[in-house]
Design a protein with these regions (language model features):
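C-terminal subregions of glycosyltransferases and related glycan-biosynthesis enzymes
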Residues: 157-158, 185-186, 202, 211-327
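Short loop->beta transition adjacent to catalytic acidic/histidine clusters or analogous donor-positioning motifs
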Residues: 2-3, 24-35, 43, 56-60
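A conserved acidic beta->alpha catalytic loop
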Residues: 37-46, 66
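Glycine-rich, basic loop-to-helix element that forms the pyrophosphate-binding segment
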Residues: 64-81, 86, 102
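Conserved nucleotide-sugar donor-binding catalytic segment
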Residues: 79, 142-227
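Short, well-formed alpha-helical segments that are part of the catalytic scaffolds
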Residues: 12-25
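Acidic helix N-cap motif at the loop->helix transition within catalytic regions
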Residues: 17, 42-50, 72, 94, ...
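Flexible acidic/His/Gly-enriched loops in nucleotide-sugar-dependent glycosyltransferase catalytic domains
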Residues: 100-106, 112-174
Length: 327
């Protein structure tokens, strides 16, 4: 079984060497590393070139002549891989030595598994542990973990983004269902997880097999669980920034892609999965349509509360309060 790593890079000179070195420390080395660089203007490409001169496995570097953005840069790396299993990699983390071998064993032992993702330790920019994991900090509950173990990964992913790219590996022969990825900001991992969960099994590994580095540029996942005030401040910012167009576009594209896969006849997608995707799509559109008039909002929200969609596809009371007060 051939292992590929798909890495997206952009101005990563500060940390990329440590990430590359962590590939060398793997108990099971990759068979190739494919890096798509999105027009770095620092020394990133020089660091990669120096690393490649002594690296024991092949490295392919794609230098984009025009900036693609995060999503399409990852797609560029993924579609250029030739392995049977593709690991996604950021440019600023550190993989622990057993990461590749542990995830690869799952694919070897479970032919129906299409995607595997693991936990990660959160560290600061100097790699000092914060004592927290990504699953803790993103409120990935034991109930959700159990649902995935029971074959309900698609249900979880519709509501909660828990399959982060840096912790993920996918079976390459399923990439034709994933690509092309819609050109929406930073959705490569969410999209990949949703599509594969609709057509194949997903396996969780409750081990922190990499160090997720939190630093000034990358603050996607916080160091600690957020207080209610911090959550409120973030919700207010999201409401002001109006992030719903991206979410709505994601679910528009998800429904269209699943319909396409069904029509192609190549994959069996349960009717229940398709119905959930459609209902999630409708819920996203409803939430994106709110005006400032509280009476009009309530008239739209109450049916979504009664039918359970706020709890099935959003964050329950938190989302209700956000829509009622902040939007």
């Amino acid at each position: 079984m051939k292992i590929s790593i798909a890495m997206a890079s952009f101005n990563g000179e500060k940390f990329i060497k440590e990430q590359l070195d962590s590939f060398l420390s793997q108990t099971r080395l990759p068979d190739e590393l494919v890096i798509s660089d999105d027009g770095s203007t620092d020394s990133t490409l020089e660091i990669i070139k120096s690393f490649s001169q002594t690296c024991p496995f092949p490295i392919k570097v794609i230098s984009n002549t025009q900036r693609l953005g995060i999503t399409k840069n990852f797609e560029n790396a993924m579609k250029s891989c030739t392995g049977d299993i593709i690991f996604l990699s950021d440019q600023d983390d550190v993989w622990l030595p057993e990461k590749i071998s542990t995830l690869a064993d799952v694919f070897n032992n479970n032919p129906k598994t299409g995607l595997v993702h693991c936990n990660a330790e959160i560290v600061n920019e100097d790699l000092a542990s914060t004592g927290k994991t990504v699953w803790e900090s993103t409120w990935f509950s034991h109930k959700e973990q159990q649902k995935i173990k029971n074959g309900k990964a698609f249900d979880v992913y519709l509501r909660h983004t828990v399959a982060a790219g840096m912790s993920m590996a996918v079976r390459a022969d399923l990439l034709k269902t994933v690509l092309p990825i819609p050109d929406i900001f930073s959705i490569h991992d969410v999209w990949t997880a949703l599509i594969i969960a609709a057509i194949a099994d997903v396996t969780l590994i409750d081990q922190a097999l990499l160090q997720y580095r939190v630093h000034g540029v990358n603050q996607t996942i916080g160091i600690h669980r957020l207080s209610l005030k911090e959550q409120f401040d973030i919700a207010r910012k999201q409401a002001c920034d109006n992030t719903f167009p991206n979410l709505t576009a994601l679910h528009d594209n998800l429904v269209k892609r699943l319909e396409y896969l069904i029509k192609s006849g190549s994959y069996t997608i349960p009717v229940s999965v398709m119905n959930k995707a459609i209902k999630r799509h409708e819920h996203a559109h409803i939430r994106s349509s709110f005006s400032g008039n509280i009476i009009k909002k309530l008239a739209i929200m109450i049916p979504q509360i009664i039918n359970g969609n706020y709890f099935r596809f959003s964050y329950g009371i938190k989302s209700i309060v956000k829509d009622l007060i902040l939007r």
